[in-house]
From Swiss-Prot:
Active site residues according to the UniProt entry: 29 (for endopeptidase activity), 92 (for endopeptidase activity), 112 (for endopeptidase activity)
Lineage, highest ranks first: Viruses, Duplodnaviria, Heunggongvirae, Uroviricota, Caudoviricetes
Membrane-traversing stretches: none
Gene: plyTW
Domain Peptidase C51 stretches: 4-141
Protein name: Endolysin PlyTW
Domain of life where this protein originates: Viruses
EC number: 3.4.22.-, 3.5.1.28
Pfam families hit by this protein: Amidase_2 (PF01510), CHAP (PF05257), SH3_5 (PF08460)
N-acetylmuramoyl-L-alanine amidase domain: residues covered: 189-311
Disulphide-bonded residues: none
Residues in SH3b domain copies: 385-455
GO biological process, one term: peptidoglycan catabolic process
Species this protein is from: Staphylococcus phage Twort (strain DSM 17442 / HER 48) (Bacteriophage Twort)
């Protein structure tokens, strides 16, 4: 059996991906659940039937089936099953990612496939979504192994240490299967690299499954040359091709785009490892082109476009979160200096040691005060502290966002009709008034709550109640 920590890694890896376990009917809800149970039981259990039949499977001591009742408390990693009402025919099934998001046992947040019925076309990927308990009748709880039992089993074979805090260059997996589209040739080598944070949750090779055949409309939204996580490099485009990765004509044409993956979901430890693989790859490419790592050849996305990218790296190595506060030119130079030093170590055949700043000692944000009590950051976002509870009255619900208060940022989820959330910040940006809060998992989320006209400062009707 896998541990809960190993199950958590699996769950995070499946966000925004599609799982077709049996090769039939595309990405059905049951495919993800079957694959999950098969994974955490080390291949011992392969569930059968439709989603509603999951509760009738025999798990041979690897999991326990619980019938839902008003006081039942689900846990992270449980499998939740719908079998009644609209779900009586086939059922629905998902994996619990937050057992009680609002602290009232009225809702559960899950990772699921095919909620909207488009899994058969493979256009609906695994999504984190919050539901009330309508139709939910059972939970299946894997009997996870304890960390201590796993450690005891592993004591006979101890892996050799790998390059201190750096990477094992010999174990990097490269996949150079490019996207199914011929981008324009540059005609000369890139003049440098630009390091991005992906604002996503997928590994480098998972991006291949998601983007390789995604189609022109998706690529036009942005496509880099390489997508990199720990020990994984997917080269989506050859170095001779122009990529669309920094919303700047010169940057797109002349710089090689590297996406450091999982910037929204990876632990600090994991993201630092992802960075190291990216630094090594940057050093390898620069050396190939006869370029040395310096301020002209190592670039950041925010040097070319008004963006928070690379938000996670900035927070770790400078101590400032660009989604919440202003970033100065000095901050940019500080992060570039860190990137250059790390890349240069690999360039010279040495092994760098990743470092992070003391978050408690981070620089206070630069603020511009307006006459109405709002502060303005260098992205033009008006913001101020405000603590209250917002209850959604929009029948269709409201989409929430990661990264920042922009409708182009990655979707975090949906606050459904009747659901409430407690927030601590209010912003005005991108044609809307937004509220922001930090989830139990430590992620910052933004949600628009009414329209806003920047020219007149007129606000539309509120999409809920504040109390």
């Amino acid at each position: 059996m896998k541990t809960l920590k190993q199950a958590e890694s699996y769950i995070k890896s499946k966000v925004n991906t599609g799982t077709d376990f049996d090769g039939l009917y595309g990405y059905q809800c049951m495919d993800l659940a079957v694959d999950y149970i098969y994974h955490v039981t080390d291949g011992k259990i392969r569930m059968w039937g439709n989603a509603k039949d999951a509760i009738n499977n025999s798990f041979g001591g690897t999991a326990t089936v619980y019938k839902n009742y008003p006081a039942f408390r689900p846990k992270y990693g449980d499998v939740v099953v719908w079998t009644t009402g609209n779900f009586a025919t086939y059922g629905h099934i998902a994996i619990v990612t937050n057992p009680d998001p609002y602290g009232d046992l009225q809702y559960v947040t899950v990772l699921e496939q095919n909620w909207n019925g488009n899994g058969i076309y493979k256009t609906e990927l695994a999504t984190i979504r919050t539901h009330d308990y309508t139709g939910i009748t059972h939970f299946i709880r894997p009997n996870f192994a304890t960390e201590s039992s796993v450690k005891k089993k592993d004591t006979k074979k101890k892996p050799k240490p790998s390059n201190r805090d750096g990477i094992n260059k010999d174990k990097i997996v490269y996949d150079r299967t490019n996207i199914n589209y011929n981008m324009v040739k540059r005609g000369y080598n890139p003049v440098g690299v630009i390091l991005h944070n992906d604002a996503g949750s997928m590994t480098g090779l998972q991006y291949k499954n998601n983007l390789q055949n995604a189609g022109y409309n998706r690529w036009a939204q942005g496509i880099a040359h390489s997508y990199i996580s720990e020990g994984q490099v997917w080269q989506a485009l050859g170095e001779s091709r122009i990529a669309w990765h920094c919303a700047n004509q010169w940057g797109n044409k002349n710089l090689y785009g590297i996406e450091i993956c999982q910037s929204m979901t990876a632990s600090d430890e994991q993201f630092l490892k992802n960075e190291q693989t990216a630094f090594y790859e940057a050093s390898r490419m620069l050396k190939k082109w006869g370029l040395k790592p310096d301020k002209n050849t190592v670039r950041l996305h925010m040097e070319y476009y008004q963006t928070a990218c690379p938000h996670r790296s900035m927070k770790l190595h400078v101590g400032k979160d660009p989604t919440k506060t202003s970033i100065t030119q000095a901050d940019i130079e500080k992060l570039k200096e860190y990137f250059i030093k790390q890349i240069k170590m690999y360039y010279e055949g040495k092994t760098p040691v990743p470092t992070v700043v003391n978050q408690k000692a981070k620089t206070k944000p630069v603020k511009q005060s307006s006459t109405s009590g709002w502060n303005v950051n260098n992205y033009g976002t008006y913001y101020k502290s405000e603590s209250a509870t917002f209850k959604c009255t929009a029948r269709q619900g409201i989409v929430t966002r990661y990264t920042g208060p922009f409708t182009t940022c990655p979707q975090a989820g949906v606050l459904y009709y009747g659901q409430s959330v407690t927030y601590d910040t209010v912003c005005k940006q991108d044609g809307y008034v937004w509220i922001s809060w930090t989830t139990n998992g430590g992620q910052d989320v933004w949600m628009p709550v009414r329209t806003w006209d920047k020219n007149t400062d007129i606000m539309g009707q509120l999409w809920g109640d504040i109390y």
